[in-house]
């Protein structure tokens, strides 16, 4: 009976994934974000499910239904605030998780990495369609601007945009289908996350040193279960502080006004977690060029394993690469700031320089830094 977890067909899978899993003894707090993303996904599915019970995906009543949730539904305000700020926490954890993968060379587990990039794209799609649902001013105009980018595709663009809209502009049909997409995507993301974990467990976790840790492994439980539990508590603390004390801090004031197709906001921008990509999109004064740059800014992650030139896996002992990594981080923060600014000087030129630096760092400077570090480590006698 005591060893049922090792023999029962279902419990055996859980046991091999979360209890008796051999884990490197030296993984740091940067390895907490995978489990934190799992918690974020569960929070979002649960709060979203209860919100969907009261929401109506109709242009005439969508905005009112959200107001009704906040005013009349028991703890509806809390559900909405947790769901909206939970999305911000989700992306914060995602960016840190990807950053950790780049810093410590985890991208060399190619299958795990590629599924992770697909997951990132799917979560971004889910967040975009979800942002449209409250049918506020910025929801509507954000949807109009971003879906309109499809029309930049040669020959089929306009047809494709109208197919997505279900008409000649963003309207009732668009809102209804976006709600359907937003509801189904978490149930696509969950199995993808399980496959992501499956491939990770084929190789075992990477560790800060980047050296094969097989000679020094410890069981996942209790060591890393307690460590993850601490992460959960900190995540929930930050989420509750956001949701209870400043729920609208990361939102857009324009979304307090119902969508009005006849009145364009002076400055259309997405949520903060898309601003870096939005800045790259805007930095190119050509519609198709901007769309290609936007796609490249995310899809570039897929070729990072091919750009690894260093003899060492991790950046832990590579100061030149470390410096470039932190310049890249600062550059992404700059792009996020620029994405939220109006299209005028000096923001235009800063955005263009930051966009150019983003691609130069990843495609040119970091691979060269790896080769330079290899050369410096060679014995010179």
From Swiss-Prot:
Positions annotated to bind heme b b562:
83, 182
> Cross-referenced InterPro entries, in alphabetical order?
Cyt_b/b6_C, Cyt_b/b6_C_sf, Cyt_b/b6_N, Cytb/b6-like_sf, Cytochrome_b, Cytochrome_b_C_euk/bac, Cytochrome_b_N_euk/bac, Di-haem_cyt_TM
Gene3D superfamilies assigned to the protein according to its UniProt record, in alphabetical order: Cytochrome Bc1 Complex, Chain C
Query: Which of this chain's residues are annotated to bind heme b b566?
Result: 97, 196
Any one GO biological process: mitochondrial electron transport, ubiquinol to cytochrome c
The free-text note explaining how the cofactor binds reads: Binds 2 heme b groups non-covalently.
Q: Tell me how this protein assembles.
A: The cytochrome bc1 complex contains 11 subunits: 3 respiratory subunits (MT-CYB, CYC1 and UQCRFS1), 2 core proteins (UQCRC1 and UQCRC2) and 6 low-molecular weight proteins (UQCRH/QCR6, UQCRB/QCR7, UQCRQ/QCR8, UQCR10/QCR9, UQCR11/QCR10 and a cleavage product of UQCRFS1). This cytochrome bc1 complex then forms a dimer.
What is the recorded name of this protein? Cytochrome b
State what this protein does.
Component of the ubiquinol-cytochrome c reductase complex (complex III or cytochrome b-c1 complex) that is part of the mitochondrial respiratory chain. The b-c1 complex mediates electron transfer from ubiquinol to cytochrome c. Contributes to the generation of a proton gradient across the mitochondrial membrane that is then used for ATP synthesis.
Domain of life, source organism = Eukaryota
The record's SUPFAM superfamilies line, in alphabetical order, gives: a domain/subunit of cytochrome bc1 complex (Ubiquinol-cytochrome c reductase), Transmembrane di-heme cytochromes
- According to the record, the segments passing through the membrane are 33-53, 77-98, 113-133, 178-198, 226-246, 288-308, 320-340, 347-367
Q: Which family does it belong to?
A: Belongs to the cytochrome b family.
Q: What is the lineage of its organism?
A: Eukaryota, Metazoa, Chordata, Craniata, Vertebrata
Compartment(s) where it occurs, according to its Swiss-Prot or TrEMBL record: Mitochondrion inner membrane
Q: Which PANTHER family match?
A: CYTOCHROME B
Asked if the Swiss-Prot or TrEMBL record annotates the protein with the keyword Glycosyltransferase, the reply is no
MF (Gene Ontology): metal ion binding; ubiquinol-cytochrome-c reductase activity
Necessary cofactors: heme b
Name the positions where a ubiquinone binds.
Answer: 201
